[in-house]
C-alpha cells in the first residue's frame, strides 16, 4: 500500500455465504489485515479462524513476529479476530489495543488467559515513530466494538467493515475491478 504499510490479509475465493443464509457472496470475500512497519510495528486485525495457521505462517515470512510491538483490533467479529489465538501463541506478551467493548468481545469469543489489553477511546493515539495511529470509536456503525484507526503521515483510515463489502479480488482498490461485479455485490 505504501513503503510502511502492507496488506497481510487473506482472499477467500471459496466463500459463498456469510452470516448463514442472510448474506450470499457471489465473488467470495477478503479478510483484511495490515502491517505497519515504522520505528515500532503494529498489526491491524487478523483473519477468519479457518485460515489462522496460514495467516501466521505467511506473517512469519513477512516479519519476525517478535518485531510486532502492538496488535490493534479495530473490530472483533470472527472474520477479523479469528487468527488472534494462534498469533498470541507465538507472541503472548504483545499488547492488544482495542476498545473496552472490543476487549469484552474478545474475552467472550476466546477466553484468553494473560493477554495484555490496552483499552483505547476516541482521540487516544499510539506513536509508531514517523507516524501515529489515532483511534476513533464508532460503536454500532457495524458492530458494538467498531473502531477506526487513522494513520497520520500516510493518511490512511483503517475502517474495517464500515465501507466494505464481501468481494474477493487480487486488487486492493475498488476502482481497479469490474464495476458491474462490484455493484452486484
For each feature predicted by the language model, list its residue ranges.
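Active-site metal-binding motif and surrounding structural segment of the metallo-beta-lactamase
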Residues: 39, 50-97
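Short catalytic-loop micro-motif centered on adjacent basic/acidic residues
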Residues: 42-45, 70-73, 134-135
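Conserved beta-strand hairpin/beta-sheet module of binuclear metal-dependent hydrolase folds
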Residues: 3-61, 148-151, 155-159
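Active-site environment of divalent metal-dependent phosphoester hydrolases
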Residues: 15, 51, 76-81, 103-106, ...
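Short, conserved acidic/polar surface loops in the N-terminal third of protein domains
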Residues: 55-56, 81-86, 107-110, 146-147, ...
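Metallo-beta-lactamase
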Residues: 1-3, 41, 98-185
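Short, structured coil segments at secondary-structure junctions
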Residues: 90-92, 110-113, 152
Amino acid at each position: 500500500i505504501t513503503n510502511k504499510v502492507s496488506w497481510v490479509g487473506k482472499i477467500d475465493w471459496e466463500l459463498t455465504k456469510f452470516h448463514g443464509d442472510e448474506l450470499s457472496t457471489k465473488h467470495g470475500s477478503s479478510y483484511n489485515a495490515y502491517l505497519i512497519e515504522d520505528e515500532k510495528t503494529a498489526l491491524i486485525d487478523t483473519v477468519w479462524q479457518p485460515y489462522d495457521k496460514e495467516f501466521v505462517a505467511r506473517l512469519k515470512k513477512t516479519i519476525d513476529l517478535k518485531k510486532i510491538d502492538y496488535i490493534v483490533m479495530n473490530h472483533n467479529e470472527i472474520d477479523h479476530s479469528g487468527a488472534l489465538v494462534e498469533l498470541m501463541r507465538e507472541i503472548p506478551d504483545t499488547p492488544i489495543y482495542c476498545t473496552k467493548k472490543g476487549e469484552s468481545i474478545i474475552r467472550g469469543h476466546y477466553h484468553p488467559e494473560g493477554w495484555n489489553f490496552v483499552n483505547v477511546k476516541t482521540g487516544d493515539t499510539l506513536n509508531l515513530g514517523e507516524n501515529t495511529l489515532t483511534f476513533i470509536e464508532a460503536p454500532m456503525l457495524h458492530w458494538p466494538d467498531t473502531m477506526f484507526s487513522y494513520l497520520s503521515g500516510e493518511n490512511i483510515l483503517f475502517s474495517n467493515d464500515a465501507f466494505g463489502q464481501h468481494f474477493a479480488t487480487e486488487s486492493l482498490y475498488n476502482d481497479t475491478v469490474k464495476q458491474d461485479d462490484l455493484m452486484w455485490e
